[in-house]
């Protein structure tokens, strides 16, 4: 037993610093809850509450990046600021275009709220859009943790390095794989069981 414990201790000492998947998963889910109240566990009805939650998330990302400098080649605070400065244009606006494509592209969709709350494709593309922005900022591992979290929940595996255009629609979702070298244009609709790249 002593030898086994020594092996485990060595493994723990050699493990590169990285935030726990639970920390990253919580960050992503909380961020998605701010962007889309349909995913929020709390109603942020007044601007003050929204600003506070937004600031908390920004600080959380700063802390994650500052404590894990091996995952990037920059300043954790600067990278977190860049992420939140680009969040509206690179994530929020594109997700609303994706939402529009999914709602209009699926005759069974009764409302955009249904797509946001129920469609695994929307959850997967949300994770991709967040992870892709982090990836473009030169942050490693964390983007992959986010897309793998979505993969475990949706059956959709999208590498954060893939290039996906605007108005992207994933219908049914299960069994979709989009690899790192994949380039998907604008206004593309993909059904279940498709591998690209």
Which functions belong to the PLM regions below?
Residues 1-148:
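Terminal amphipathic alpha-helical/low-complexity segments used for targeting or macromolecular assembly
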């Amino acid at each position: 037993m002593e030898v086994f414990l020594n092996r485990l201790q060595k493994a723990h000492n050699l493990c590169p610093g990285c935030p726990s998947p639970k920390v990253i998963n919580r960050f992503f889910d909380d961020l998605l809850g701010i962007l889309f109240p349909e995913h929020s566990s709390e109603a942020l009805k007044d601007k003050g509450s929204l600003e506070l939650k937004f600031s908390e998330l920004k600080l959380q990302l700063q802390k994650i990046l500052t404590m894990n400098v091996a995952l990037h080649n920059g300043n954790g605070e600067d990278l977190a600021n860049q992420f939140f400065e680009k969040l509206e244009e690179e994530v929020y606006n594109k997700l609303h275009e994706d939402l529009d494509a999914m709602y209009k592209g699926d005759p069974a969709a009764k409302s955009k709220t249904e797509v946001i709350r129920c469609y695994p494709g929307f959850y997967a593309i949300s994770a991709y859009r967040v992870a892709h922005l982090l990836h473009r900022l030169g942050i490693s591992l964390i983007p992959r943790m986010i897309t793998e979290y979505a993969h475990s929940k949706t059956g959709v595996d999208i590498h954060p390095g893939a290039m996906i255009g605007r108005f992207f629609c994933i219908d049914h979702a299960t069994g979709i794989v989009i690899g790192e070298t994949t380039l998907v244009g604008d206004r593309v609709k993909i059904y279940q069981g498709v591998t690209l790249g």
